[in-house]
């Protein structure tokens, strides 16, 4: 869950998955009822939110503001616009392992370096980035029992750009008690980092030496394309409960490597960092390399029930991919409605667990063959995560407000074989703790 430079890029672009999810949710509302008299169109409904995310030990923090606006443009025809701006700062892990001696790393630009104290976690503490994201969607009925949603999305960062389109279709059956939905999304994303894209598995070089970069220190660009497909069914079980099932398929092609991640090459007995290229004054660090294709399949189910005026929901998601990552997510909410004024209190618990990618390595041993694909990015490693939180909301004269606070904890498992020599004295997969706070205000309803 860590929010850092590549939080949106480690797998499927969120513009794709997020747009597809939004389109699908928009289509799962009530079916289009027949109109027999003219009705007044709904005014603009605007929902604005501010979110703060902060990791422990001075690591990454994120401050985000977003606005969601929806306007009925005709009978059951809605235009939805979103704008998000966020800024990230802090210390970002680069994939190297701790050492009993100070370590020096060349920054991604190739124009500067930084040093980590002996025994310290290899973090680049000058990381910062900003992101602006825009999206628009259009919902409209195509018959009495069906409707469609079409949308576009765009986001821009200093070194990364996303563009995407999405489409959704939903059809009601069984006296509107059953809804079948289909969705598709396509995105094209581009990396364009300062200093150029590193050559996969090349050694890190000293400041001003671009031999390890594919573009000689220029702003080389690499692209990836992502396609998402979704099919789902939502069933009303009785007046108090509904259930939903979704299957989604995601395919990514192109540059799926993180150009900012490296691996340490250490002595297989002492665990001490091997010397880097002659004259560089650095240890031996190799830039990671991931496969150029990835296919993910997800199975999702949600059960929601009204319990005497309160609402309980539980969902489960299983994801598997051809990188050999399998994940399980269980999400639970219980909304206590507190009478007049729309007041409610909603506790939230989330459990997450995943296995490691087949090419994940905590480090590499000097003298051993280097795999074709390898990464020390701990987001690709084996870990478990737990989130607990609470949300409060109430109506206002012109809308509604809500606030939530969540605590996140993540613990992982490094490769046991990597704890050799000096490395046995360090935690090669440190725990991660984070706090999430959000406030939102909705008006115009």
Please identify what each model-predicted range represents.
Residues 82-134, 179-240, 250-253, 344-394, ...:
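Outer-membrane beta-barrel translocator/channel fold
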Residues 54-62, 126-130, 154-164, 291-294, ...:
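Solvent-exposed loop/turn segments connecting transmembrane beta-strands
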């Amino acid at each position: 869950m860590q929010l850092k430079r590549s939080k949106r890029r480690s797998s499927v672009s969120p513009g794709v998955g997020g747009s597809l999810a939004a389109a699908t949710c928009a289509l799962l509302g009530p079916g289009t009822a027949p109109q027999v008299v003219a009705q007044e169109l709904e005014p603009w409904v605007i929902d604005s939110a501010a979110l703060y995310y902060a990791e422990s030990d001075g690591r990454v923090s994120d401050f985000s503001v977003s606005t969601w606006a929806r306007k009925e443009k005709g009978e059951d025809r809605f235009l939805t616009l979103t704008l998000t701006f966020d800024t990230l700062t802090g210390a970002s892990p680069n994939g190297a392992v701790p050492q009993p001696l100070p370590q020096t790393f060349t920054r991604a630009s190739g124009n500067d370096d930084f040093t980590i104290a002996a025994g310290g976690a290899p973090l680049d503490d000058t990381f910062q980035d900003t992101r602006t994201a825009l999206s628009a969607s259009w919902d409209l009925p195509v018959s009495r029992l069906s409707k469609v949603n079409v949308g576009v999305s765009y986001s821009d960062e200093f070194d990364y750009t996303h563009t995407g389109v999405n489409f959704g279709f939903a059809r009601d059956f069984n006296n509107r008690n059953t809804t079948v939905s289909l969705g598709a999304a396509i995105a094209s994303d581009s990396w364009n980092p300062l200093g150029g894209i590193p050559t996969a598995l090349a050694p890190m070089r000293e400041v001003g030496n671009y031999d390890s970069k594919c573009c000689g220190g220029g702003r080389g660009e690499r692209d990836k394309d992502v396609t998402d497909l979704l099919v789902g069914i939502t069933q009303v079980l009785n007046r108090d409960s509904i259930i939903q099932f979704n299957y989604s398929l995601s395919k990514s092609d192109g540059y799926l490597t993180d150009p900012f991640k490296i691996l340490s090459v250490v002595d297989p007995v002492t665990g001490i960092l091997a010397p880097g290229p002659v004259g560089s004054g650095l240890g031996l660090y190799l830039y990671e390399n991931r496969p150029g294709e990835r296919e993910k399949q997800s199975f999702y189910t949600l059960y929601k029930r009204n319990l005497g005026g309160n609402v309980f929901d539980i969902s489960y998601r299983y994801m598997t991919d051809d990188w050999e990552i399998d994940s399980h997510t269980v999400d639970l909410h219980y909304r206590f409605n507190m009478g007049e004024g729309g007041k409610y209190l909603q506790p939230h618990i989330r459990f997450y667990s995943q296995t490691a990618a087949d090419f994940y390595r905590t480090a590499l041993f000097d003298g051993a063959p280097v795999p074709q694909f390898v990464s020390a990015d701990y987001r690709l490693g084996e870990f478990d995560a737990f989130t607990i939180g609470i949300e409060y909301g109430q109506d206002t004269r012109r809308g509604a407000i809500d606030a939530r606070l969540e605590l996140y904890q993540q613990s992982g498992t490094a490769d046991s074989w990597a704890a050799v020599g000096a490395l046995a004295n360090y935690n090669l997969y440190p725990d991660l703790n984070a706090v999430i706070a959000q406030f939102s205000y909705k008006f115009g309803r």
